[in-house]
Amino acid sequence: IRDRSPSRGLGDVYKRQRPDWEAAGAEFTDDVSAYENMKLSLLNASHSLLSYPAFLAGYRRVDEAVRDERFARYLRLFMDRDAGPYVPAPGNTDLELYKKTLLERFGNKAVSDQISRLCFDGVSKIPVYVMPVLTKMIRDDADLERLAFFIAAYRHYLKHGKDDRGRAYEVNEPWLTEEDRKLIAGDDPVDFLGLSPFRSTDLKAADKFVSQYRSMVEGLEKDGVLSVLEKMVLP
């Protein structure tokens, strides 16, 4: 209850007396789905969006990456322009404060996380945290630049085994199928869009996404993460 998060939504299933958690800022509700959507779409998805690009750029801790203004702006743009339109504010939540607090936490060394942990098991995380937002954005003909960058970075991470500083790493993806491994090893980056975590949406049929994704793949191969990121987030 001492959590500084601006939103603490709890399902009101208590039938007997309970502590006065409202005094600490908790908000009770009969339906927590809106709070869950907010957490998955903003907090968890932002962790995923950060993971592979930051790791490839050479960062190993979340706070270090987010103190790089390029990554901080990338995440804020994702929250505001990509996920934000699909996240109605639950209850009395101040979404602007929520997003601001998330970025402050990500940059807090005292509670930082290892980026390698965020990279672990993208096959399970991406369908839950990222694909719902990407699917809606494709449907609405939104700007897909940041999501294309993320998917391209995921491919680069799985395929190459070295970050942009030349350091080798081991990929920890326990649920990759044999078909997934063939798609990763293939030369055509569009084939990668058939990977199992993307199967909720036919990404290869989304021409706008494919075009932006191809451009990101080429940029990562030629110039590296930070160069592509800088061009993407500059005003």
At which residue positions do the language-model features occur?
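Single conserved hydrophobic/aromatic residue that forms the stacking wall/gate
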Residues: I1-Y14
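Glycine-centered flexibility sites
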Residues: G9-G11, A45, G58
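Active-site-adjacent bridging/hinge elements
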Residues: R16-D30, P53
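Short, hydrophobic/aliphatic alpha-helical segments
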Residues: A24-L42
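Short, solvent-exposed coil/turn linker segments
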Residues: D31, R61-A65, D94, D188, ...
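Conserved phosphate/anionic-ligand binding catalytic regions in large, soluble enzymes, centered on
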Residues: K39-A54
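C-terminal catalytic subdomain
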Residues: A54-L176
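C-terminal amphipathic alpha-helical interaction region
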Residues: F150-A152, H156-P235
